Amino acid sequence: MFQLSVQDIHPGEQAGNKEEAIRQIAAALAQAGNVAGGYVDGMLAREQQTSTFLGNGIAIPHGTTDTRDQVLKTGVQVFQFPQGVTWGEGQVAYVAIGIAASSDEHLGLLRQLTHVLSDDSVAEQLKSATTAEELRALLMGEKQSEQLKLDNETMTLDVIASSLVTLQALNAARLKEAGAVDAAFVAKTINDSPMNLGQGIWLNDSAEGNLRSAVAVSRATQAFDVEGEKAALLVTVAMNDEQPIAVLKRLGDLLLNNKADRLLSADAATLLALLTSDDALTDDVLSAEFVVRNEHGLHARPGTMLVNTIKQFNSEITVTNLDGTGKPANGRSLMKVVALGVKKGHRLRFTAQGEDAEQALKAIGDAIAAGLGEGA
């Protein structure tokens, strides 16, 4: 985990334009002993190649591979510009994080930062923060409320089971491992009978022991009988705030529209999408899967190429890292795409809904095959 010092954070700065802002940041990196004087040329050259604007008012200026020899030690300098700095194409940066890193050390840092900054509320707080301490707490995720835990780690699919107790125990264990519940919750949800929602779907929860909002799902390989009723899938909810309500609403919509059977046959990524994305409930969604071959995965430059390809089309497009959390992200947001933590060899599933969905998926596949600007 990268550690950020308050000495590396500069609140309330001003710059007339992007170049001036980058020169200020480069000077701070040099002053801190992170880079030699020539690194600024690489930072400016990088902007000519691809804008380092991530979205949500955040930019991450950094050098090119040609100036890696100018890096003395890995580090960052964070500049806050409350009045904003135009970063091109109508984009305004309020926080610029200058990165100095040799080899590929910056990729882990970038993924860490984008995971925090992809939260829209955090980005807004970064604009209005007034002290280095407050900015540091936001960037390190110390002030970030915990997001709903519902991903591959809280799902157990294709379980050999002939009773609900097996599914109850699996879900309780998953939630306990995630730090979402305590022993009282585990005991309650294992001992009490779940509620039958119909169509093979069952639900349980507990008023006690909720430490963090999370949802666990377990599914039997084959449906079984519980007192004359079909049982195949159990959803267990830990509720510490209102976040699980949206999941329960989507579950309710599936049941009302007699589409809950999708949950019984879907793979992990599709099941997550059904419970977390409204688009997944429609019938006119197309999907395609591609493998990322870029040596360093989807960092800022190939990520930008991917997002720019997606923005050429009108369809709503989401992307899911099948080898990551499995949760879908908005394909038009560079911040959210980079936060997926895509590495070489990871499988991405794209879903598209709209009049040009088929063309969009083909263009995405072609762009990935061509190396997203880094060569095939």
UniProtKB/Swiss-Prot annotation:
Residues 285-375 form the HPr domain. It holds the Pfam family PTS-HPr. Residues 2-142 form the PTS EIIA type-2 domain. Gene3D superfamilies: HPr-like, Mannitol-specific EII, Chain A. Its main location: cytoplasm. Induction: Induced by fructose and repressed by FruR. It is found in: Cytoplasm. Residues 156-284 are annotated as: M domain. GO terms for cellular component: cytoplasm; plasma membrane. The modification Phosphohistidine is found at H62, H299. GO terms for biological process: phosphoenolpyruvate-dependent sugar phosphotransferase system. One of its GO terms (molecular function) is kinase activity. The active site is at H62, H299. Keywords: Cytoplasm, Kinase, Phosphoprotein, Phosphotransferase system, Sugar transport, Transferase, Transport. It comes from the Bacteria. The phosphoenolpyruvate-dependent sugar phosphotransferase system (sugar PTS), a major carbohydrate active transport system, catalyzes the phosphorylation of incoming sugar substrates concomitantly with their translocation across the cell membrane. The enzyme II FruAB PTS system is involved in fructose transport. The PTS EIIA type-2 domain is phosphorylated by phospho-HPr on a histidyl residue. Then, it transfers the phosphoryl group to the PTS EIIB type-2 domain. In contrast to classical PTS systems, the fructose-specific PTS has no requirement for HPr; FruB combines a IIA domain with a HPr domain. This is Multiphosphoryl transfer protein. It comes from Salmonella typhimurium (strain LT2 / SGSC1412 / ATCC 700720).
